[in-house]
Structures are given as C-alpha cells and as structure tokens.
Amino acid sequence: MASLDLPYRCPRCGEHKRFRSLSSLRAHLEYSHTYETLYILSKTNSICDGAAAAAAAAAAASGFPLAPEPAALLAVPGARREVFESTSFQGKEQAAGPSPAAPHLLHHHHHHAPLAHFPGDLVPASLPCEELAEPGLVPAAAARYALREIEIPLGELFARKSVASSACSTPPPGPGPGPCPGPASASPASPSPADVAYEEGLARLKIRALEKLEVDRRLERLSEEVEQKIAGQVGRLQAELERKAAELETARQESARLGREKEELEERASELSRQVDVSVELLASLKQDLVHKEQELSRKQQEVVQIDQFLKETAAREASAKLRLQQFIEELLERADRAERQLQVISSSCGSTPSASLGRGGGGGGAGPNARGPGRMREHHVGPAVPNTYAVSRHGSSPSTGASSRVPAASQSSGCYDSDSLELPRPEEGAPEDSGPGGLGTRAQAANGGSERSQPPRSSGLRRQAIQNWQRRPRRHSTEGEEGDVSDVGSRTTESEAEGPLDAPRPGPAMAGPLSSCRLSARPEGGSGRGRRAERVSPSRSNEVISPEILKMRAALFCIFTYLDTRTLLHAAEVCRDWRFVARHPAVWTRVLLENARVCSKFLAMLAQWCTQAHSLTLQNLKPRQRGKKESKEEYARSTRGCLEAGLESLLKAAGGNLLILRISHCPNILTDRSLWLASCYCRALQAVTYRSATDPVGHEVIWALGAGCREIVSLQVAPLHPCQQPTRFSNRCLQMIGRCWPHLRALGVGGAGCGVQGLASLARNCMRLQVLELDHVSEITQEVAAEVCREGLKGLEMLVLTATPVTPKALLHFNSICRNLKSIVVQIGIADYFKEPSSPEAQKLFEDMVTKLQALRRRPGFSKILHIKVEGGC
C-alpha cells in the first residue's frame, strides 16, 4: 500500500508522512514533535468539532444552505481529516503571528460584528458561501469546503428573538390586536416560526454538541485503551522478542553442539566403516581358514577312520596271534613232555659206562673194542653239542629262528647234566652243525651214567632208534614277522637268562649266580673256567628244569614290568630270581628316569648293561656324593664337577642309535655341556633334547657339535636356568646357530639375558616350521619386537610360552593377528621380572596395573580361550 493511500498524514511533515491509524500518528507526534504541538492539535480539534456542529444546526434552523448535515460531514473520514488538518495549521499560524490572510479576516470581522467568529477559521473570506451552497457540488466536495470558515449568526438570532419578544409585548395599532406569540404571554397564541426554529435549532445544537462531546470522550477513552493495549502488547512482544533471542542463542549453541556431534559421529562412522572393512577382510580370511580347517578335519576324520580300521585289524591279528601263541605253547609243552619221556626211555634202555670211559675213551677198566666203540660214538655226538647249544643261545633273539627248537634245548641244557661228570672236548671241524639231538641224548646218558655206574652196558639199538625218532620230530617255525616278538617272549627271557648277564661284569652277589647252569651251557670256555664256575653251583640247582608255569609267569611279569619306573624295577629285582630275571631284561629298560636321588658314575655304568634298548633317558635333579667334613666348598665343587659324565657316557654308548629322547635338567656342576657333546658322538638318532643348567649353559660351540652329530632333532630345550652363573653365554649367536643347524625344528625353548631381537628374528627366519616357542627370562617383548620377529617367520606357530618374560598387551595382539594357527598363549610373570625392588608399594601398584591390562585382553573376542596368565608373587 502506497503512502498517499493512507488516511492520516502528519500536519508538520506534510503529504509524504501518512499513517494508517490515529495511534500511529499520535506516536509519531510524540516521538518526532513537541508536546505543545500535540496539545494545540487536540484542543483545536475539539473546538472545531463543536463549532462545526453548532453552525450546522443554525443553518438548518434558519433554512440557510450553508453546508450539508453536520452528522454527514462528521461521518465522512476525509472531511473530518481535512477539518483537523486545516484547523491545526491555522491555529498554529494564529499562535505564531498574523498570517497573510489576517487583514481579510479582520475586515470580515468588522463587517459581521454580530457573528460569532471562532479563532480556528480555516477557509478564507474570498470564498463566498454561495459557492459552498451550489447545488452542483457533490456531498464530498461540500464536506471538503463547507467548513473552511464557519460563522454562526448568534447575534442575528438573538436580535430576532428580542424583536419578536418586543412585538408581542406592545399591541399593534390595528383594529384587532393579535395575540402575543411570545412564550411569556398567557394567551394561547402560538409562537412565531422564528422562535420555534430558534428553539429547535438551539436544542438540536445542544444535543449535537453533547453527542459530539460524548463521542470525543469515548474516542479518547478508546484511544487510551488502544494505546494501553498496544503498549502492553509491545511489552509482551519485547519480552517475547527477548525470549526468542535467548531461545535463538540457545538454538545456536545447540546447533554448534549438534555440529560438533555430527562431526564426531561422522568420524566415528568413518572409523566404524574402516573397522567393518577390516572385519569383512578378517571374516573372509576366517572363512578361508574355516574351509582349510574343514578340509583338514575331513582329512583327520579319514585318518581316524583308517586308524580305527587299522586298530581293529591289529586287534584281530593280535587275538589270532595270541591264539596261535597259546597253541604253540601247548604244543611246546607237549613236545617238552614227549622229549622228557623219550629221554627217560633212552636213559632207562641204554646202559651207562664209567665216566672215565666217556671222558677219555676207554682209559681204566676193560680196554677192548667193545668198550672203545661206544666211546668213539659218544665223542662223535658229544663234540658238536657245544656249538649247537651256543648257537641257540647266541642267536635266540633272532625272530626267524623257531622257538620250538630253542626253548627245549635251553631248558634241557640248563639242568639235564652235571658238568663235573663230563669233560666236553672241543668241537671238530668236520662235525655237522645239526647234531644237537644226538649231543643232548649223549649228555643225558652221561648224566645218568654218573649216578648209575653200577648198571651193565646194554645194546645201543634202542638208543639209536630213540635218536632217530627225535631227529624225525616235526618242526614248527613262526612265519609272520610281526608276530615274532609276541611268540618269542618265553625264548627271549630264557636266552637273556642264559647269555645276558655274562656279557657284562657282575657288580655283586645279588646279580650273580641265580642261573649258573645256564651260563655254563651258554659259553664255550676252557675246562678250567667251567670247573671254577661248576664249583659254585649246587647239585640241586644244576638239575633244575624251567617249567611251563615259570615261563608263563615270566611272560606275564614282562608285560607288567614294561610299565614300571626305574626305581621300582631296581626294587623288583630283589624279590626273587624270576623277578630279577625279568626286571633286568633290556626290553623293560626302554624308558630310564632318574630324578631326585644321589647317584654315582659306577651306578650309571651298571645300568648301561640293561639299557641297550633304551629310547628315552631322563636325568633330573641328581645330586653327587655328600661333602666331607674337612672338605671346603671349592674343593667339593672341583671334585664333583662332571663326576657323572663317565657313567653317562656308558649309558649313551650302550643305548646308541636306539636313544631318541635325552633330558638333562637341574644337575648343576655334575653334568656339564660336555654331555651334549657325548650325545652327538654316540646317539645320532636323537629327536628331542633338553639341557637346562644354571652353572654350565650351552654355548654356540656345543650347539654346533650337537647339530653336526644329531641332524634329526625336532624338539630342543636349551634355555638356561635362573639364576644363571653365566647369563650371557647363551646369546644371539647361539640362536643363529640353532636356526642354521635345525631348520626343521618344531619345538624350541630358549632364554637368557643374551637373547635379543636380532637372534630371535634370525631364528624365526630359518625355522619356518616352528610350532612351539618358549622364551624364558628374555628382555621385554614389545610390539616392535613382535613385529620384527613375526616379519621374518612364525607363521605356523601354535603355542607361545613366555616364562618370566615381560610382555605388553599390544605385542600379544600382534602375535595373535599374525600367527593365524595360534592356539595357546601362556604368560607366566612375576613382579621380580619387572622391578628390581618388588616389595615397594609403587612397584606393586604398577605391577597390578600391568596384570589388569593383560587380564583385560581375555575379554576380547578370540582371546578368552587361548590366553592363559599365571601371576607369581605380587597379585
């Protein structure tokens, strides 16, 4: 809406300042103009309105067409506005001084003295009233120009009133006096029209003036109420504005906070997206690993099925072998009984000759051809008997040799003759080897001849027939190679009794003499030696025969004694002869364990004779002899240094290539690193070696010697014990030498203060198949150390053991992320591994924080099952 279309304008500013309402105009006047101007305008407005109403009423009463109806003029907003504006301007001009139109107005006042002229006249006198009353003017124009100058003829009205009243008081000179039209007369004559018009006009003027005043008062009250309402609303709006401003500031701050949160959320979203990408990659790798594991599981299941099938087949074959063994033993017993009966028949049917004729071929007694013939025949049969028996006893352990031909010969030769009654000649070169039956028969005959010398000689026909029947006996041999060990248990025990104790020196009376007759039949020594041993054998023992029940008992003991430890075997050998026979068989000394005992080198040398089949040797926490009362510690340490190495050498030499596992631990000063050098010389098939010592840790020279001699080692534990007297002997050079000597290592345990990142990285680079790694008392493992070591290898690591080795949580996380096959992480730490003063409160608090951080890793996914933390002293 343009400014010219607004209904109200400022009288001071002119047309260019128009307003929509009176309140806005009033506010403009209050703020832009003085209070005097506003007051003058208010008073002028009231006077002008009252004068206009009075003039309109007088004009209507006199019939003078001065202006339209005042109500109509007041009803027109434009006319009222023009009246207000003109009145206010003229009032101000009169207050300031005489205007240019002042002379005309003064002249008009002198000509119309009776007229009441208001000081707010707006229209100049040059504009006649006739122009205002022209019928051609429209009401709007009349309303605009009629009240420019309003003159109310109050003097004329009063003059007319006085003339009328005087006319009524004096009667006219005419014949008939008329009635007095005045109101004071008592005659009922009617008043004059002028009086009536005057009265009516005056009444109407009063009414209109009162109405106008009432309207003005109401307008003033309304304007005041409106102004109050506007002021209240403005106050409310200002309060609302302040509240909105505060809310806007709060909203701005909230917007800034939301912006920051948005940035944080965007960063978090980007981080989560990266984590999701990493998780997706990890999930893909895990899926691939799962596929590989499933394939491996299927392979393992197939292997398990094959192993189950193999076990079932083996069980079936074992059952059949046991059945055949039982049948064989029964047949063997039957054959032994039959042989005994045949020997009894032979001994009862054949006559015996004096021992002189059997031993010297007819020296003493009758010397005829009848006497020499049987003597020569006996010599022919007796001569090859010794090599036959020796061959059976020496080759009894061969699985291809039939047990049916070994056990009877050994059992018969152990107690069927007395060596004092017969002197065996040396075997002839041309004698056949398979003349054992004849020799056995001749021995039996000679043995019986010693007790039956008074019987006359008989014909040799029956004896020859019995010998032929013995030679035509059926022979049974084991045909299956895998059953040789099972079916040969009895023969092995008998043969070991016959030959085993003779090869080694006898340590004392507890080991000597239980089976002297067997020794006599087993070793082809000279007559003097046999005579000396025969003197120590009682006649009752020399005539003993090993019964089948004893063979069965020895077989059962052999099955049991294989599960006994070394100490129990040594005690079991003291029970009886049969127990000693089984307890000292090399087949039960496959696992030798000596621990927590005081031993000497001679004891180890004695054990060496039974450890020829040992495949595991463990020496742990052994102690030397006690220190003498007058012996100083230095002398004692010097005298006991390496004191068991001679006996250990005997053990290693006896075991030889059968030894697969060698463990030497906690044997300070009595076993040095020379033990590994001895093992490299005698036991080249070693697969697992453990050597841990606090006084003599291994060096790179010993590792080189062991690597040159034993190339098949897959498990090596050579970490020095703590506290070590030579902590820097095991260094990075040792780690490099281990990696070069055994690239196929599967398990390794190293440690010491000399181990560093360089040696561990070289070890990881060379040993690509390493599955178990143990670090003992190594310097702190940080994330950088873990990254350097894992960069070179350890991709197939399955178990990581950190003993007394400080480690950070980030290092464990790195190991777990790089070593995909890692199944177990064992961390054994103590407060002394981190701090030199573990008893101080600060050290204990820091150690508790470290342990808490390590324990927090167990709550991470994937760590709860593989991470095992063992804390020693501090928490």
Curated annotation (Swiss-Prot):
Asked if DNA-binding is a keyword of the record, the answer is no
Bias kind Pro residues: ranges: 170-182
Stored Pfam families: F-box-like (PF12937), zf-C2H2_FBX41 (PF23165)
Per its UniProt record, what CDD domains does this chain match?
F-box_FBXO41
Name assigned to this protein:
F-box only protein 41
Q: Which residues carry this modification: Omega-N-methylarginine?
A: R360
**Which keywords does this Swiss-Prot/TrEMBL entry list?**
Coiled coil, Methylation, Phosphoprotein, Ubl conjugation pathway
In this chain, the stretch annotated as Disordered covers 85-110, 165-194, 347-542
Q: Where is the F-box domain?
A: 496-540
- The UniProt regions of compositional bias labelled Polar residues, in chain numbering, are 347-356, 395-416
Origin superkingdom: Eukaryota
Species per Swiss-Prot/TrEMBL record: Homo sapiens (Human)
Where in the sequence does UniProt note compositional bias of the Gly residues kind?
359-368
Q: Which residues does UniProt call coiled coil?
A: 209-351
Entry-annotated residues carrying Phosphothreonine: T479
**Composition skew (Low complexity), residue ranges:** 183-194
Q: Would you tell me the Gene Ontology cellular component terms? A: cytosol; synapse
